[in-house]
Amino acid sequence: MIKQKIINLLQKKINYEKLKIYNESKKHNITHNKNSHFKILIVSNYFINIDIIDRHRKIYSWLSIFFFKYKIKSLSIYAYTTLEWKNKKCKSFFNSPLCKNKPNS
């Protein structure tokens, strides 16, 4: 539900070549909010001539409502231009470890 809302909002704000959103909440020791930790990969030429900090600021500003309304605790952002993504050597960085406080299942 929240994932789709994030997708819908980003579709209105930016033209992108690639968008992936991962819900990483299950990797954390949280029982009351199954939508608390997200990771976003977005590739768009919108980011040309925008430094990494400003890319993140822009995306956070677009998604700020979700932090309060849905109590999102963590958002990791990977924002690239098309050329940066094409030249990226390792694209498997999306394998996040389990949270330190997450008990083994």
Swiss-Prot record:
Any single Pfam family the record assigns to this protein: BolA
UniProt cross-references to Gene3D superfamilies, sorted A to Z: BolA-like
UniProt-listed SUPFAM superfamilies: BolA-like
Superkingdom of this protein's organism: Bacteria
Family named by the database record: Belongs to the BolA/IbaG family.
Full protein name: Uncharacterized protein bbp_418
Organism: Buchnera aphidicola subsp. Baizongia pistaciae (strain Bp)
